[in-house]
Structure formats: structure tokens, C-alpha cells
Amino acid sequence: MEQLWLEHDLSEEWIPQPQEQGSDNSSEPPTTSNVNNTQSTGRGSSGTSTEHGTFKKGRNDAPDVPQWKQVNAKNPVARDIFARLDLENMFEESSKQSPPSKSPTKNPSKKSSNNSSRRSSSSVGKLSNVSNMQSSPSKDPFVSQDYEKESISSSQFSKKYSEGSLKSQQSNTRSNSVHEKQNTDHASNASSSSSVVSSPSLKPNNTSPLKLFQGASDPFTREHLNQLTQDVKSNSFENGEKQFSLPEPRRPQKPMRTTERKASLNTKDLYQEVEEVMARLRGRMPNSGRESTIFLPRKLSGLREEEEQDEISVEVSQEDSSNAFPSLSDQLHLKSLQSMKRVTSIFNDNDDSFPSASSSPQRQAYMTDKMPLREIDVGSSQSSSKTARLNSSPKSTLKTSSVKTRRSHSAQSSRKVSDYPNMVVITPADLPEGIDTTQGSMEFDRIHNRWRRKGHDSDLGFDFETDEDASLSHPERTILFKAASTRHQANNDPNNLEKQQPHSFPLRKQNVAQSEFPKHSLRDNSENAPQILSSFHDLSLQNESFDEMFNGRYENGSPIPFISSGSGLKSKADKDAEYSFSVSRQSIIQILSDVEPYEPFWKRIIQLDISRRHLDSLIGLSELCPSIEELTLEGNEIAYLTGCPVTIRDLNAVENRLSSLTSFSNLLNLQYLDISYNQLEDLTGLSSLIHLRELKVDSNHLWSLDGIQHLDGLLKLSACNNRIKELSFTNSNLHRLEELLLGNNEIEEIEEISSLQNLMVLQLDNNKLTNLKASQPMIHLRILRISNNAIHQLEVDQFPHLRTLYMDLNRFNRPPDIRRLKRLVNFSFRTQDPEASNFVIQPSLDIRNLYLSNNTFVTLDCKHMFLGVRYLELANVQLKEVPKYIATSMPNLRVLDLSHNYISDIESLKPLQMIHRLYLVGNRIKKMRNLCDILANLKQLNVLDLRMNPLNFNIYPVIDDSIYELSAASKYQQSINQKGHHRKEDPQKQWQEKELAFSSTLSEAWRTRRKMYAEAILLACPHLEWLDGSDVSQSSRAAFTKSSN
């Protein structure tokens, strides 16, 4: 399908033809909307001529219009780049054209027409396309020799030229009329008087003339274009000749070089361009690796700078247009020269950068020697450009030519210019003076490119050393800070940690002699130090970490401006503390891994036991296990509870290193606290635990209970084994206290004990009490233990509802009247004053357990039946026979202890059918037969102890007091003669070891006698489980049972 010509395509594919000087349209400027060209060609079949070269928009009556392949007329870049080039079609068809009969004549054309056309096109900044390429004989190797022999004759060409001239005038007239009506087509005029005739090689079926420019897809370089233009000039017509022949078709003398084109198009460092773009996006300022056209950023300070900048940009564009694609060798050579210029400018600028106070010859020599060698690398354009950018100083407004601006970096501004027009970097120097750069108490320093507090003038030079420290540092190592022009000299000093770039810089490890630095700076205040420290987050050290550098090299002095070693940097103690925190956290993680290997469950742990793990800190536990409610820390070395989760309700910290300095203020949810066996001297640290319900502070160094007496929610308090001497509850707020354990102290007197109205358990064993009085009855008291004191008298009426009363080891002249205690169940009255007279005890009817051992003269009044008695202990009371009231008044007795008396006959025990345990240690039982008859009646007997009797005196070792005390029925649950809760060795184990050693010394006869004794007892008591301190095995009992049957 035939396509229509568009104005945009015609303006790009055709150029206006020159006209004669007498033409009517000679004064009209050329346009690009419509093009009117004249062509004189003849068809081979008919020989008639038609009007060609005049095209109008919307005309379909021109069958010979050349058809163009178009993809998008308005977007020349989107054309089919794979289509056959017009140049190839022209030369291919010209070789097949049938030439005229006459030989050609060479008539050069006038140079004025071509020159005028070229100047007209170049004035708008764009070269027009060349139309109607004339073909003339040439020595070009691309043109065949047959075409040279068959050229058009001059007479024949002259005739056709005259006809074409007439048709051109008619076409121009018609074109003007169409332009007046439709305003679409416009005649194309030129300054020359002659028109260019078409070549005989161009036929209607051919494609259009060569399109030299195709937008951004130009396949020819500027060098080829210049060569082609000069060829056209050389083949143009000479002045003064009115008849001329078709010029020879010229081609460039050199064919297109594929290698040259690739070099000119592929020498760009695309990888470096990508790095630069990404660096800009990250906020960094990398050095420019490309040496192409530089687009300078416009300043916003005034209209004059904008106009100058526009002129500079136009000049740069025009100059770069002559050589837009330099060769690879030229670019490398240009980079080398610019690198040398930058290095030279560095040393030239060093003389003017430092102030007079620091620009001595020694200072310059020192800075030159200390400059890193990598900055003087001439062959590397990247490092050279970086050095030039770091050591350049701000200059005045740029007013030189574009060539000097682009080529000379010594006079260039220190601002980083962009390689892309759409990526202009705006530096703080571009900000106008009118813009407010203050924010609160901070203001932006335009020179040093940082924020600072108001009132600090960074424009003025100042020294960071004080007068006192001036003698400690070397005069040549003085650190000055003037303005931006001195930055590059300070950066060359390897000991200076000042930032060399706005964002980051590499700090190289240098082997420099260590010198002293000032201890304090002029701005050594706590407000600036954290802000300055945050700016050093991107320091990169080689072969040495940042912490090692500051702990070792900069420990005694800091060369960093605004920072001293005591205020800004971390001290060694801080680093040690941080290290210890890390170790503690790792210990917690390791312990948690042992307890619960699956880490996601750590946050769900409610109960945690990490006893005896050698822990000394709990730092990190609250972050790892935030839901813990019950924590056991027994047997560790914890001194502080920092790191404990605030959700803890039950804390067991027994046997640690807690002291009065330990704070519990963060554990407000504590309800149950056990801090026994620690080093507390007072309880003031627990005053904030308002939710505390139970508190155990046993085995500490407490002197009083001050600090917790206002905790009205406290229910249980245990402060045994401390150093408490006086105790007063006068102003106490412990109204809800139910259990108070104060044993093993040095309490002499207790005031206002009756203020604890809800008290149910009172334990005052092993103290120095002489009296215990209550101002009012304590009706809720159930258990009272006052053993091992010096009490002479006790009014039991003050405690009417007592159920347990322990009064051992006191100095009572007379026993208390326990008949009034109707609810008394357990009564212990062991070991009273030996000077006391005969005691007569009248227990209540509901009594169950009576402990009356170790009293010289004690008598039990049993006029009534005591059906509730289950346990009776009458050891060491000098009994010669078993009392008869035991069998008659206490028929439900389960345990009877009559040890260490003078009993030889137990005949009165036959009625006790319910007895389970019988202790007769240390009596005078001799007859085996009578014993076996009585034991046979005790069907429920399980435990029997007959040691230290004449019956078995030589077959058992002697029983120690401690063994007897805990093995017999008269055992005392608590050691009376010793303070504290020190556990004794198991008496059962002691007896077994002693018995085994004694058995090894027995002769065979005594071993046989011992065996016969055991068999006889087991025959009498078949259900016996424990005999004389040893367990009876089931095999032995079965053997005895079998033998008895």
C-alpha cells in the first residue's frame, strides 16, 4: 500500500535546492515543512517527461513518487535500522543504468551554491541531508569502469537542463499558490542562480537520495561527513560557466573502517559511569573517570551568573561538536596530561594553603614526606582526580572560556561537577545567602560542610592545643584548623583523623613515631562529643580494627578535632564493662541452650531453674526470656539483679552474693522472695516491693527488720540465723502477717508482739528471751515455739487457741497449766531446770503427742482416759518399770519410747495391741524367753530397738549420743545444742558403718550367737521391718517364716 509523505519526513530526507538570482522566491527564506525539488529524468519506455521533485501533502496522483519505509515519522530513532541503506541502493542501481551515447564532460559547479547551503543548514545547529546526489566519473574503486565510458554528453545534458529549468519555475509558481491556500507546502529557494540537475542514475522506482543523518542512529562518523562535504565542494561547478555536466560521483578515498567505528563508539567506560551514578545515589562524590563534555551546575546567586553559564554551555557544545567522538588513543593521552597537571597543581597550591604560622620550610617538608605515595600516581587518572578534588580550594565566579574551564583543573572550583545535564550536584556553596540555614540551636557551616552550634565561628583559625599542653606536643605537629583552603594539607597528615571527604575516606595505617597530643580541646564538652562521634561511623582501617586503634594508639591522646581522650572516646573501663556484659550474655545464652535447646521457646518460658551454674550476672535474661515468672538462682555468685525480667513473681536467690547495695526496685511484681545465705545487713532495699507476700532472709547479717515493716501485704517472714537483738512492732504495719520465724538470733525482748493480730505461727527458738508477754490475747496464734531460751514463766491464757507448744530447754520452776489449752495437740517439755522440784503434768483431753524426756522428776497425771494420745516419750526419766497408766489410759498409743531408764520387765505392755514402734534402748532386759512371749502379742509391731541391753550387749557396738538421739523415739527434730541449720550426717548411715567395722572383729562364736538372736526376734514378730538400727530384708523374713511353719 502506498504511503503518504509527511512534512517531518520530507524535511529530514530532502534539502532545499539552490535557485537562480533572478527568481521570484530568492528572497524567501528556506523552510523545512515542504520541499520542492526539480528532477529531470526520462522514462526508457515512452521518452516523455513528467514533473518530478514537486511533492504536495495529500496528493495521490503522482504514481512515480518514491515510497519510503517508515515506522514512526515523528520518531526517527524508531526507524528500521536493518533496512537497506540508500547509499547502497544508489550505487547498486547506478552501475546497472544504461548510459547515454555521448561521452561525459566534466563541468565543475560553483562553490557558492554549496557553501551557501552548508552555511544555511549549520546556522541552526544541524546539517541538512544532501539531496540529488550527482553522479560523475570518478576514480572511486566502488564505481565500475563501464559507467565511466557511457556518460551523458554535454549537449544532451544541456537540453535536458533547459527543460528542467522551465519546469522548476512552473513548479515554484504552483507551490506558492498552494502555500497561500493550505499553508502546508513551501518552495525551497537557494542563493545560487543555477539549479542542480538530477543524475540519470536516479529513476522513479529508485529509493530516495542518501539520508546522511538518521537522528541518533547515524552510521557515519563526523570524519566521513567532512570528507564527503569536501568531495562535494571539489566537484561543484566553476564560476562563469553556464553549461556544466553532471559531477562525478565521489566516495571517500578510504573505505569505512570497522575497527575505527568500534573504537570511537566503545571507548566509553560504561562500568565506571554506572559506578558514578550508583555512588551519587548513595550520597557519595566519586572522582570522574570520563574526560568528556562537562556540564557545569548553575548557581542560584543571580541572573548574571545564569547568563554566563548559558554562554559557557553553548560554547562547550559548539566546540565539542567538532570532535564528539575522540579516538581511544586521544582519550588516553588526554587523561595522562590531565593527571600530570593535577599533581602539579597540588604542589603549587600547597604553598598558599596553610597560614603563615604553619607554612615554615620544616612544615612543608614534613607534609611532603608524609603524603601517601598512592596520591602521586601519575598513571592513574582516578587517584589523580581524587587528589585534585580533595586539595582544590574555592575560587571566584567562573568567567573564563569553556575550554579553560573544562581542561584546566587547577583553576576549577572545588565543587563536583556532573557528567550528565540532568544530574547536577548542588553543593552548600550554591545556596544563596538569603536561605535560612539555621535549625534551632544549630546552624550549617558552609565552609566545613557540617552542622555546628550557634556562636562557634569556624571561619576563624584556632588551635586545638591549650597553653598548658603546648609544651607537651611537637611544634611542627600542631594541628590548625583555618578554613576550607587548609583541608587538603591537614588530610595529608597520617595522624589526622579529620574527614577528607564529605562522607567517607580511607584511613591508612602509617608507621609514624608516636607523639603526645593535647588531652583537652577547646570544645571539649559533653554536648558535642556524641554528635562528633557519630560522624566517624564509616572509618575504614586496614589490618587493624577501630577499637584496637583507639585503645592502643589513641589511648593517651586524641588527634581528632573537638574530641579528647577523656570525654568523647570510650575509656578502657567502659570497654572492659562492655566486654563483661558480652560474656555474661553469652553465659546466659549457653545456659538457656542447655535448659531449652529450641530458641523460639525461650520467650515462652515461665519457670526457669539455673541453680549452681557459676553465674555472676543476669544481663540479657530479660531480653531472651521476657515471660519468666518463677526463677531459681540458688548457688551462684550473683551480686546484682540487673537483667532480671520484670515479670518475675517468685525469685529464689539462695547462696549468692547479694548485699544491701543490691536494688530490687525493678522487680515490683515480686510476691515470693528467698534471699537466704547472702550478705544483707538491712532490708531497706526491699521497701519498694509492695506486692511481696513471702520473704525469707535467713542466714544473713541483719540487725533489724527496718525497711519492711510498712509492707502491709506481707504474710510470711523468716529471718532466722541473723544478728537481731531488739525487736519492736509498735509502729509496724504488718497487720496481715501470719507467720514470723525469728529463730537463732540474739533477741532479748520483743515489744508489742500482740500488734500482730493475724499471727498464726511464732518461732523464737535459740534466743535470749526471759519473758514473753502480750498486751492482749493473740487469738489467732496456733503454733508457739520458745525452746532453748531463759524463760521462767509463761502465761498460756494469752494464747488460748494454741495447738502446738514447744518449751524445751528453758528454766521453768513449774510447768505451765496446759489444761486450759483445750485445743492443744502437741506439747513438748523436755530438759528443764534440774533444780526444779517434782513436775506433775495434767494434759488436756485432746492431747496427742507428749514429749517429756530428760526430766529428773516428772509425773504424768492420768486420772482420765486419754484416748487421743498417739505418741508418748518418757526417755531418761528414771523409770524402773513401765507405768501401768500407759496400758489403761492410752489404749490407742502408736509410738512408745522408754529408752535410758531402769526397766527390766515389759509385762505390762501386752495390752497395747495397736503399738507400731517400741524403743527400749539402754535398759536392763536380760531374759530372751519372756521378751519373745510379750512381743508375740504385739501383732502390729514394725520397729523394735533393743540395743544396749544385757541381752545383746556383746553383739552390737556402743551407741553414741547423737546416734541415739536421732534413731530412738526420743529424737529431737531440731538440734538444740547448735545454732543454725547445719545438717548432721545421717545417723542411720553412721550406725551402719560402725556396725560393719564391729562385725569384722567378731569371732565365729559371736557371729553365730548374733544370728540366733535375730532369728528368734523374727520368729516372734513376723511383720517386723526394722530391728536394732538395720532394715530387715524380705528374704530373711521369708526364710524365718518358712522355718517357723
From Swiss-Prot:
The question of whether Repeat is a record keyword is answered with yes
Its predominant location is cytoplasm
Q: What is the effect of changing residue 98 to A?
A: No phosphorylation by cdk1
Q: Name one Pfam family in it.
A: LRR_8
- Give me the LRR repeat coordinates as residue ranges: 604-625, 627-646, 647-668, 669-690, 691-712, 713-734, 736-757, 758-779, 780-801, 802-822, 846-867, 868-889, 892-913, 914-935, 940-962
Q: Name one GO molecular function term.
A: signaling adaptor activity
Q: Which domain of life is it from?
A: Eukaryota
Q: Quick one: effect of changing residue 199 to A?
A: No phosphorylation by cdk1
Q: According to the UniProt entry, which residues carry Phosphoserine? A: 360, 558
Q: Which InterPro entries match?
A: CDIRP, Leu-rich_rpt, Leu-rich_rpt_4, Leu-rich_rpt_typical-subtyp, LRR_dom_sf
Keywords from the named record: Cytoplasm, Cytoskeleton, Leucine-rich repeat, Phosphoprotein, Repeat
Q: PROSITE patterns recorded for this chain?
A: LRR
Please indicate if the UniProt record lists Phosphoprotein as a keyword: yes
All copies of domain LRRCT, residue ranges: 1005-1043
Q: Where in the cell is it found?
A: Cytoplasm; Cytoplasm, Cytoskeleton, Microtubule organizing center, Spindle pole body
Impact after mutating residue 947 to A = In cdc11-123; no interaction with sid4; does not localize at the SPB
Provide the assembly information.
Interacts with sid4. When hyperphosphorylated, interacts with byr4. Also interacts with spg1, sid2, cdc13 and cdc16.
Role summary: Essential for the onset of septum formation. Involved in the organization of astral microtubules during mitosis. Acts as a bridge between sid4 and the other SIN proteins mediating their association with the spindle pole body (SPB). The sid4-cdc11 complex organizes a signaling hub on the SPB which coordinates cell and nuclear division.
The protein in question is named Septation initiation network scaffold protein cdc11
Q: Which organism is it from?
A: Schizosaccharomyces pombe (strain 972 / ATCC 24843) (Fission yeast)
